């Protein structure tokens, strides 16, 4: 590999030349404007890009081991198939930039601002994203084992088919974040803020959400077996067709939450608020509803066999065609055994079918 000086690099960029197969180990490009540069198979190990501007620059198959990008500004920058082990992007600003099939093990992204950044098929083991501002960033099919994303803020971020079981999100906040088919099993999400987040078809078994905010979150089709959901605020959250078997949900807010078709077998809701909760067609055999406030809740067509409703508060709580064999009640005051109008409509429909026969 040949060598180039910083001035020669700048000249080649201005001429539109591709800079390829050169050894630039340890070179200082501090504060340089490398916008529009095209680099292929260049060794930038130990180089210093601090405060540089990389707008619409492309780096392909380059080596960036322990390279310093602190306070760099990347806009529409592409890093593809690069080895960036232990590189440092601390206090960098990354906008609409892409890391594709890059090795980013132990890379530091501390206190960075990321807008529309994409990490696709990257190796991010032990990467450090402490105190990041993520706005519309995307993680796709990347490895995040032991990566640190502590004290970070996520807005409209997407995690697509990610294994997040060993990722550290301590003290982070998530707003409208999408987790699509992700694996979180056994994760510790205590005291985290999740607002209007999507957990569609996720694996959340044994996840600890205690004392977290889950308002307006969507857990449709997700598995939450043995999950810890105590002292949470899950107001107007969606648990449609979710599996909360043996989940611990006591002393929590589920007002306006929707559980249609969910599995709630042996789920513990003791002392929780379930006002206006929609629990139609749930299977809640052996579930615990002791001391719950179920004002205006709808349990139509649910299987509540052997469940415990002692000391629960009912007011216009609908048990329309609800299975209740072996269920325990202190009293049934406030329970509507059926919806008269719906009952009449069902009877009429049954009669019409019989006449056709």
Regions picked out by a protein language model, each given a short descriptive name:
Residues 2-357:
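Tandem repeat scaffolds
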